[in-house]
């Protein structure tokens, strides 16, 4: 009996129904709830699993390098990045007929292949890789790191190498090591790689271990560094006629502040990037020496927080009690980490297209679209997770006595005001934005398009102008040649920046109008509503006027029995569950907007977006319907083409998505009755009744069915849009 799954919960292991299996899977990673768990084992398990996570990441990235080296066309792509399609890997499928073999044989390959839309070719090229041998070397190195990570994970589970709880709670040492060691040293090392390998590579010099010490990255060597003439490193940058990867038009500078983009590659100057990483390294190396450890110098975070008492006393006791609250709650720490990572991931999406760092990636439109969408969806899931763990913190770890009248307690004290303000903002945005869209639809439907309400986003245009965009005619700050800001930066970084902002060949500061104004507010509605649901879930997690004892029921409960009305659907988990739908919805609008605006930009018919985006039918007809027409003809009565796989995935995504509703709209009793009928029939059917079950079949719990429904909804939604995005972009631009 003791060996039945799940071993971490004897109570569940003895459950005679199928609940044992599903609850076992659901709580497998909730280490806190396991039998015999101690704080020490909890920290050690999580620590060891981090090494497992690293091993998986290194193995996966190693696989990317290996498959491109083995089955890709990296060396051919390097010769002509703009016209050769990068191959991710070969496809071996015995079911392919001749038309499919021909359709998927591209990029100079001998057989069917997948095209890479991940940007790895551009990245590897930019950082100095040139041959398949380089890729194999990288793959082997990452495989080695993966093995080391696995060994480290195993080692830290052995009694002799298990760290103590005090080691895990030594926040100052951890911060110092992470700031200096992880961020500082790795940024410095990356600067070194860029200066010694990537920049020479961009100038036609092939630097590897065998000649690393004999090729100087800069003709003056280390002389200027030791004599304080650092400005020499910025002199003689690459010229505007520089051909990337060749000495033609190349300079000698290694650390510059040029601004703008390399004219040929349309990506940031490598020498600017190296300079940026050096500055980051310096900042983080300093930051990693700020906190007090064994040496008695530096800041104590606890002292810093305790000293932060707001003036005037109107904000209570400020940060008192926060240090111990955060340091003793893994959920609080995870919530903070997820919130930060979520913001960073969304920023990556925004900056990868507007300020592309990798050579030629800006001209690979499908990759640009795929990377933007990928990072925004990832950000959405990470951000909702931050609030989920924030809510679990309030339920499991929050101690009111420890946090009396500090910022946390005051958030809870003022939750009604916070939630109602968010609600008001959401309602205002929703009704006004929808009102404008629907009004415009009615005007077009009634044949009076001139009566649309079209609002110019003058404040946003003013901000763009302040940053140097001249087309709107605002004479302000960087768009005014007389301003001190303009004159101060004139000789340093501004020429490159101003050229980039005012050139129409990139995505920096796109021209905006009434359609942008409307969709911006639709997105704001989505963001505020998602935030409202998440914030309400976390702030009401401990209890509310309706259910003051909510925290005693845990993070996810369906209801408090039939006798207590209104207690269904109000667990913190339910808030997370509802918020994910809104999150997906919002990111849908974000990616629709980004994609449609860019498709019209790349095709040179921007007026289509400008004219059709001001009413709902325009979005449905001229974005969704028009761009799916090519996709759904991936296979038809006349044959198939290279979009057929995306056409199939588009269909399949819709099916997965629709399956979600089966779990979301029918409730537990229906399934329980159905299961009992099926079990009755099974037991009375010859042959079938030879198969017996150890666990009595029962329906999923309400919460579990919602999770399964949500998973299908999310996965189907993302698969559908991914297929649409990649097919509609690659179908137009190759």
UniProtKB/Swiss-Prot annotation:
P700 is a chlorophyll a/chlorophyll a' dimer, A0 is one or more chlorophyll a, A1 is one or both phylloquinones and FX is a shared 4Fe-4S iron-sulfur center. The keyword Transferase does not apply. It is found in: Plastid, Chloroplast thylakoid membrane. InterPro entries: PSI_PsaA/B (IPR001280), PSI_PsaA/B_CS (IPR020586), PSI_PsaA/B_sf (IPR036408), PSI_PsaB (IPR006244). The keyword Amino-acid biosynthesis does not apply. Phylloquinone binds at residue 671. GO terms for cellular component: chloroplast thylakoid membrane; photosystem I. It is a multi-pass membrane protein. Chlorophyll a B3 binds at residues 662, 670. The chain crosses the membrane at residues 46-69, 135-158, 175-199, 273-291, 330-353, 369-395, 417-439, 517-535, 575-596, 643-665, 707-727. It catalyses: reduced [plastocyanin] + hnu + oxidized [2Fe-2S]-[ferredoxin] = oxidized [plastocyanin] + reduced [2Fe-2S]-[ferredoxin]. Chlorophyll a B1 binds at residue 654. GO terms for biological process: photosynthesis. GO terms for molecular function: 4 iron, 4 sulfur cluster binding; chlorophyll binding; electron transfer activity; magnesium ion binding; oxidoreductase activity. Its EC number is 1.97.1.12. [4Fe-4S] cluster binds at residues 559, 568. Keywords: 4Fe-4S, Chlorophyll, Chloroplast, Chromophore, Electron transport, Iron, Iron-sulfur, Magnesium, Membrane, Metal-binding, Oxidoreductase, Photosynthesis, Photosystem I, Plastid, Thylakoid, Transmembrane, Transmembrane helix, Transport. Its main location: plastid. Signal peptide: none annotated. PsaA and PsaB bind P700, the primary electron donor of photosystem I (PSI), as well as the electron acceptors A0, A1 and FX. PSI is a plastocyanin-ferredoxin oxidoreductase, converting photonic excitation into a charge separation, which transfers an electron from the donor P700 chlorophyll pair to the spectroscopically characterized acceptors A0, A1, FX, FA and FB in turn. Oxidized P700 is reduced on the lumenal side of the thylakoid membrane by plastocyanin. Belongs to the PsaA/PsaB family. The PsaA/B heterodimer binds the P700 chlorophyll special pair and subsequent electron acceptors. PSI consists of a core antenna complex that captures photons, and an electron transfer chain that converts photonic excitation into a charge separation. The eukaryotic PSI reaction center is composed of at least 11 subunits. This is Photosystem I P700 chlorophyll a apoprotein A2. It comes from Glycine max (Soybean). The lineage of its organism: Eukaryota, Viridiplantae, Streptophyta, Embryophyta, Tracheophyta.
